[in-house]
């Protein structure tokens, strides 16, 4: 199973990495399930499916809920190569006995989304530009404070490691990822998901941050006034994503107290 851009870390694969994965999968006849539901939110618009290099053995899973900003509208898709029709038929049989079908309103919305349009392309380009700038800003604040974290490359997640503060956190009686998230929520009002939820060791001081607590409509409208060839000005994120930045800065303040 591949998941990229990834949840919970916002990272992705390079073309060379995908080619190597494809080479190994082909050599050992491995079926790849490539979860690419965040592919449209690759921050540079450069998402490449591993199916390009291993089409005969790759199943692509995707959907509308992420790139459409429609979290409650659950319409997922699986794309199978012809060589795996037998597996597609088996999955369809199980699905028909599990949830029967997608609700009609979601199907009508899905038709419009999958048809595509220039308006959708403009929305995606604008969303990527904002998420990229905001992700880099959040990354820089945490990294400058000494938190171990990768700069996100897609989606809207980061997976920071607070172990450089383990001694200080132990003095606060914060000994695992659950305690870390509970204390930050109680004391600073910042909600994160503990690393334990992603099968990380409980004592590991990791957590997922989802940096989307901002006014999407307002930021998208403001972004559309800036020409496509220009980067967002330095004050754009501060002006339109202030709640997210306040949350990240609250984490740093809490670590330094």
Pin down the residues of each PLM region:
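Conserved glycine-rich beta-strand-loop-beta hairpin in the small C-terminal domain of fold type I
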Residues: 128-139, 149-168
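PLP-dependent enzyme catalytic core of the Aspartate aminotransferase-like
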Residues: 169-174, 183-192, 198-257
């Amino acid at each position: 199973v591949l998941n990229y851009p990834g949840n919970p870390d916002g990272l992705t694969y390079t073309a060379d990495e995908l080619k190597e994965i494809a080479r190994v999968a082909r050599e050992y006849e491995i079926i790849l399930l490539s979860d690419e539901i965040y592919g449209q939110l690759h921050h540079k618009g450069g998402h490449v499916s591993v199916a390009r290099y291993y089409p005969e053995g790759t199943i692509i899973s995707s959907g509308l809920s992420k790139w459409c900003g429609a979290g409650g509208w659950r319409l997922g898709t699986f794309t199978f190569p012809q060589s795996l029709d037998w597996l597609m038929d088996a999955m369809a049989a199980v699905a028909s006995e599990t949830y029967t079908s997608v609700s009609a309103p979601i199907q009508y919305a899905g038709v419009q989304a999958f048809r595509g349009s220039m308006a959708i392309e403009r929305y995606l380009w604008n969303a990527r530009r904002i998420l990229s700038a905001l992700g880099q800003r959040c990354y820089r604040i945490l990294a400058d404070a000494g938190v171990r974290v990768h700069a996100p490359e897609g989606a809207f997640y980061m997976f920071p490691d607070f172990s450089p503060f383990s001694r200080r956190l132990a003095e606060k009686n914060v000994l695992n990822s659950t305690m870390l998230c509970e204390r930050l929520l109680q004391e600073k009002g910042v909600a994160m998901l503990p690393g334990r939820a992603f099968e990380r060791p409980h004592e590991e001081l990791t957590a997922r941050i989802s940096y989307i607590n901002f006014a999407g409509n307002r930021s998208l409208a403001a972004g559309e006034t800036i020409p496509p060839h220009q980067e967002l000005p330095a004050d754009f994120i501060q002006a339109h994503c202030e709640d997210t930045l306040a949350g990240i800065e609250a984490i740093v303040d809490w670590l330094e107290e």
